Amino acid sequence: MEYRRVKDQESYDVVSQKDIESPGERSLSSTSATSSLSTAGASKGNNSWKLKSIVTLALTLLTSSQAILIVWSKRAGKYEYSVTTANFSVEALKCLLSLIALYRTWNSQGVTEDNRLSTSFDEVSVYPIPAILYMVKNLLQYYIFAYVDAPAYQILKNLNIISTGVLYRIILKKKLSEIQWAAFILLCAGCTTAQLNPSSDHVLQTPIQGWVMAIVMALLSGFAGVYTEAIIKKRPSRNINVQNFWLYIFGMLFNLVAICVQDFDAVMNKGFFHGYSFITVLMILNHALSGIAVSMVMKYADNIVKVYSTSVAMLLTAVVSVFLFGFHLSLAFFLGSTVVSVSVYLHSVGKPQPQK
């Protein structure tokens, strides 16, 4: 009996000791878990911030250098290379990059119904329309520099916001807020102000041909963008790289037709890459990577990042053009680019809120 009482007392002491220590241990475990979650959250936040910063910087540099590289690729005021072959090279490179991305997806996830390349005629038949629109728009961007300089091009390029917004309303039946309509008016005013030339007999620096080409490019870009978005949203589960692949395939085909129509003799006699320089190669890489950067913005960042990149790119293009091409920064250009930046920002934040 005495022995049993001693054992019971020892068991009670052990249990009591556990009861005394448990709250502290639980508190310590809880503190450790909270600390781990906080550290993980902070690390995730830092990684997200770094990724957004890298994507923003990349998109800004690519956007601002597009017009500069096109102008810089000229020799004695004209293109020594064939612009149709350059366009074809851009589409081919984007197609290759899409295949590389798909290959990585197949290795990690396997081939599924949504990421396989084989498809139906009905699905593929919708891609020729945006492909040919993008081809014409991309060709026009080479010829518009006969009438505008690089900074003016960056300003006028924002006209596609207006065409995209109006076509969104007409084709996709999306409503535009009052702020967005006001942003359109500001955008037109900013583009016009930036082109004012008080020191010349001509009111605007850009001739009528440049404005017409800029408006046509904006319409083509807007319609192609809205049409492409409608295609993508028709089957949202479809891998974006598969959709891009087929779009770029048709882009290559149409650019091949353009080569045969416009530059067939020159390509056959002088070669496909005749007149290419290091700047030309950089320009092709820039155009291909710009599309990837925009996709990364949509996936890893948000639309406001694209807005900031566009605004900074306009000013950065102007500053670089001062040193490379002797561009003169005027008060009208500075005020106009500021108004354009504000209008782009208002268009982004003025999106109608979804009804609950």
Curated annotation (Swiss-Prot):
<feature type="topological domain" description="Lumenal">
    <location>
        <begin position="336"/>
        <end position="356"/>
    </location>
</feature>
<comment type="function">
    <text>Sugar transporter involved in the transport of CMP-sialic acid from the cytoplasm into the Golgi. May transport important nucleotide sugars such as CMP-Kdo (2-keto-3-deoxy-D-manno-octulosonic acid) in physiological conditions.</text>
</comment>
<feature type="topological domain" description="Cytoplasmic">
    <location>
        <begin position="173"/>
        <end position="175"/>
    </location>
</feature>
<feature type="transmembrane region" description="Helical">
    <location>
        <begin position="176"/>
        <end position="196"/>
    </location>
</feature>
<feature type="topological domain" description="Lumenal">
    <location>
        <begin position="147"/>
        <end position="149"/>
    </location>
</feature>
<keyword id="KW-0812">Transmembrane</keyword>
<dbReference type="GO" id="GO:0015165">
    <property type="term" value="F:pyrimidine nucleotide-sugar transmembrane transporter activity"/>
</dbReference>
<keyword id="KW-0762">Sugar transport</keyword>
<feature type="topological domain" description="Lumenal">
    <location>
        <begin position="197"/>
        <end position="211"/>
    </location>
</feature>
<feature type="topological domain" description="Lumenal">
    <location>
        <begin position="261"/>
        <end position="277"/>
    </location>
</feature>
<comment type="similarity">
    <text>Belongs to the nucleotide-sugar transporter family. CMP-Sialate:CMP antiporter (TC 2.A.7.12) subfamily.</text>
</comment>
<feature type="transmembrane region" description="Helical">
    <location>
        <begin position="150"/>
        <end position="172"/>
    </location>
</feature>
<feature type="topological domain" description="Cytoplasmic">
    <location>
        <begin position="233"/>
        <end position="239"/>
    </location>
</feature>
<feature type="transmembrane region" description="Helical">
    <location>
        <begin position="53"/>
        <end position="73"/>
    </location>
</feature>
<dbReference type="GO" id="GO:0000139">
    <property type="term" value="C:Golgi membrane"/>
</dbReference>
<dbReference type="Pfam" id="PF04142">
    <property type="entry name" value="Nuc_sug_transp"/>
</dbReference>
<feature type="topological domain" description="Cytoplasmic">
    <location>
        <begin position="1"/>
        <end position="52"/>
    </location>
</feature>
<dbReference type="InterPro" id="IPR007271">
    <property type="entry name" value="Nuc_sug_transpt"/>
</dbReference>
<keyword id="KW-0333">Golgi apparatus</keyword>
<feature type="topological domain" description="Lumenal">
    <location>
        <begin position="74"/>
        <end position="82"/>
    </location>
</feature>
<feature type="transmembrane region" description="Helical">
    <location>
        <begin position="278"/>
        <end position="298"/>
    </location>
</feature>
<feature type="topological domain" description="Cytoplasmic">
    <location>
        <begin position="299"/>
        <end position="314"/>
    </location>
</feature>
<keyword id="KW-1133">Transmembrane helix</keyword>
<keyword id="KW-0472">Membrane</keyword>
<feature type="transmembrane region" description="Helical">
    <location>
        <begin position="240"/>
        <end position="260"/>
    </location>
</feature>
<keyword id="KW-0813">Transport</keyword>
<feature type="compositionally biased region" description="Low complexity">
    <location>
        <begin position="27"/>
        <end position="43"/>
    </location>
</feature>
<feature type="transmembrane region" description="Helical">
    <location>
        <begin position="83"/>
        <end position="103"/>
    </location>
</feature>
<feature type="transmembrane region" description="Helical">
    <location>
        <begin position="126"/>
        <end position="146"/>
    </location>
</feature>
<feature type="transmembrane region" description="Helical">
    <location>
        <begin position="315"/>
        <end position="335"/>
    </location>
</feature>
<feature type="transmembrane region" description="Helical">
    <location>
        <begin position="212"/>
        <end position="232"/>
    </location>
</feature>
<protein>
    <recommendedName>
        <fullName>CMP-sialic acid transporter 2</fullName>
    </recommendedName>
</protein>
<feature type="topological domain" description="Cytoplasmic">
    <location>
        <begin position="104"/>
        <end position="125"/>
    </location>
</feature>
<feature type="region of interest" description="Disordered">
    <location>
        <begin position="1"/>
        <end position="43"/>
    </location>
</feature>
<feature type="compositionally biased region" description="Basic and acidic residues">
    <location>
        <begin position="1"/>
        <end position="24"/>
    </location>
</feature>
